[in-house]
Amino acid sequence: MTILLDRKTAVLVQGITGKIGSFHAKEMMDYGTNVVGGVTPGKGGTSEHGVPVFDTMKEAVEKTGATASIVFVPPPFAADSIMEAADAGIRTCVAITDGIPAQDMIKVKRYMRRYRAENRMCLIGPNCAGIISPSKALLGIMPGNIYLSGHVGIVGRSGTLGYEAAAQMKELGIGVSTSVGIGGDPINGSSFKDILELFEADPETHAVVMIGEIGGPQEAEAAEYIRDHMKKPVIAYVAGLSAPKGRKMGHAGAIISAFGESASEKVEILREVGVAIAPTPAEIGITAQRVLKAA
């Protein structure tokens, strides 16, 4: 079993006729993802990589029965695309787009609260790598060849550090159930806590690797959830131990602005609740191996 995505999940690509959307749609299809169509306003009635293109998400969902979508839409229009997906009945939406204005994401978050919690779309991102369930399906931009199918979940703000963790674990023969990149923006759809809840409920996930970074309260909130609810072992790496306060480091959300937002403070908070800490990026894999052997 995987979380959020399996080989049967019917996927729509929003922005499929653009250069980036078209490229990654093909990559996902080649990996085995069940891409059933795409959406580009004004391009309805055409096709891309053998799947139909629709003008609206509503029409696309009605015609294909899709339950998931991925957004490759320029920043000025991405928020509208996310809200359109929610209104069309999409259950899981991955927003790859980087540079969506914070004000637009506040609008998206407020808009999605109109729906009851049980009917609310799960938004992953924006500015994220997406989701991969190895050997089953890819809903994102990850390099599928570095993932081995297995029983360790990965969740991280940094896509590339998620790749690094997966590659190290593959070399050690440790497989991944699902990997989720939640994105590095200060306002995003799903938090560490949201994804940890899904992994804790998944019988095929035996442990979780969590990759955090400086800035924001997400790691502290995750630590509280781990302390109170998680029975599965958690391994963590927090990027930015040498980052100076007040300077943005890569992601828009990677900036230390308050107590508890530095990497060292986050490491201490996580260690206090029993999380195994990888001291460097190069040691994520061996830390996971050590924890799994002890479990």
Predicted feature locations:
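Catalytic-core regions of core metabolic enzymes
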Residues: M1-A295
